[in-house]
């Protein structure tokens, strides 16, 4: 029965094995798509490497960012992923839809790399200015929000679109960190404007933040990753954020359930099912309780734990960590798979995934701090 302490060194080995000449690969498996350096995966992996003072992951982050910078689009856009194929570099900015979140992940990664003393600021400033400018252009109407196409962020085969909580919060966080690191007050001011919109217009009656605002409607689904990123972007103890984090705990952890990526689950009798069923690249993964459709992702479980710690919710954090150990104890053959199904807690998706290995490392350190 594996514990966090037993899995932590194995997770580290996965993360070290994922390093390549062009950066940190998404997973240590012989599958072409997961051999790519994805911007979001590389940054998420690298951020924890910086926190742990791990030179291998820190260098992997730097190499990943260099690769992405070298293939930045003419308008400032950042690739979703870059991969080596038959000795040639293949660059993708998104296939089903453009991956807008890559731009903010890149800005955040560069800022953190410089903050931790792993690079001088000079090599990154021009590319970051271009990246931030393209987001300003995408804002288009001066609302401080960016309209995200369906599948335009990490949930790339899910029905999230519009003025998504996740992408606005990620942009705000990246601007805040970049503004502080590169001494750019205008970036910090912009971050504050975005956060003001989120805390004033996205809060629902139940205490959660809306997953997205769209013309004429509000997407009221619970977006765990969106709440986690918002928690990182806001000051510790921000009342609306604290309330939302507690509501998530009350609705899941206190009922003996780890929080899925999105709730509620979309079932075949739901009006949205046909759209979800047809929205995929390599086959439909979003069966009920699977993948984005109610799947439990270790990386977002870990970031939720970080959010609880950041905002002073220690009792909720300890309950989460205890539940995490119980769930892991039931998986003797755990191999850092992509997600757990929220109905049976079966493992699903790609094994030896850096997202998952990073989540385990974060949970391990939070438990032992």
Q: What do the PLM-derived regions correspond to, one by one?
A:
Residues 119, 183-186, 311-313:
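Short helix-adjacent coil turns
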Residues 35-142, 168, 241, 298-305, ...:
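Aromatic-rich carbohydrate-recognition surfaces in CAZymes
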Residues 297, 301-331:
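C-terminal hydrophobic structural anchor segments
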Residues 25-44, 51-52, 56-58, 88-104, ...:
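Solvent-exposed loop and edge beta-strand segments that line ligand/cofactor-binding
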Residues 5-21, 34, 75-83, 143-149, ...:
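Catalytic cores of carbohydrate-active enzymes
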Residues 61, 243-246, 314-323, 339:
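Composition- and surface-driven signal marking solvent-exposed, interaction-prone regions
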Residues 48, 109-112, 174-177, 181, ...:
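Core register positions within helices of long alpha-helical scaffolds
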């Amino acid at each position: 029965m594996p514990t966090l302490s037993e899995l932590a060194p194995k997770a580290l080995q996965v993360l070290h094995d994922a390093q390549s000449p062009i950066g940190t690969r998404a997973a240590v498996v012989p599958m072409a798509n997961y051999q790519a350096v994805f911007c979001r995966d590389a940054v998420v992996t690298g951020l924890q490497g910086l926190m742990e003072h791990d030179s291998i992951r820190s260098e992997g982050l730097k190499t990943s960012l260099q690769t992405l910078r070298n293939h930045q689009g003419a308008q400032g856009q950042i690739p979703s992923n870059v991969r080596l194929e038959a000795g040639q570099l293949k660059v993708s900015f998104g296939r089903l839809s453009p991956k807008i979140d890559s731009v903010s992940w890149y800005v955040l990664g560069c800022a953190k790399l410089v903050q931790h003393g792993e690079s001088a600021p000079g090599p990154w400033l021009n590319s970051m200015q271009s990246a931030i400018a393209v987001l300003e252009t995408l804002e288009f109407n001066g609302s401080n929000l960016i309209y995200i196409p369906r599948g335009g962020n990490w949930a790339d085969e899910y029905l999230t679109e519009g003025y998504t909580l996740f992408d606005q919060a990620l942009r705000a966080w990246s601007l805040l960190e970049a503004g502080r690191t590169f001494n750019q007050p205008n970036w910090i001011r912009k971050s504050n404007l975005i956060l003001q919109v989120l805390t004033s217009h996205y809060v629902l009656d139940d205490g959660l933040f809306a997953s997205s605002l769209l013309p004429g409607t509000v997407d009221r689904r619970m977006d765990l990753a969106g709440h986690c990123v918002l928690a990182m972007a806001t000051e510790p103890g921000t009342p609306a954020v604290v309330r939302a984090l507690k509501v998530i705990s009350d609705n899941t952890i206190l009922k003996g359930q780890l929080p899925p990526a999105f709730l509620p689950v979309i079932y075949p009798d739901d009006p949205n099912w046909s759209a979800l069923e047809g929205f995929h690249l390599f086959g439909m993964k979003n069966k009920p309780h699977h993948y984005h459709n109610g799947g439990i992702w270790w990386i977002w479980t870990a970031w939720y734990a970080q959010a609880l710690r950041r905002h002073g919710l220690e009792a909720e954090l300890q309950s989460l960590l205890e539940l995490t150990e119980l769930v892991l104890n039931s998986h003797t053959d755990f191999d850092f798979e992509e997600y757990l199904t929220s109905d049976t807690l079966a493992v699903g998706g790609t094994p030896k995934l850096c997202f998952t290995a990073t989540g385990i490392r974060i949970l391990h350190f939070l438990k032992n701090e």
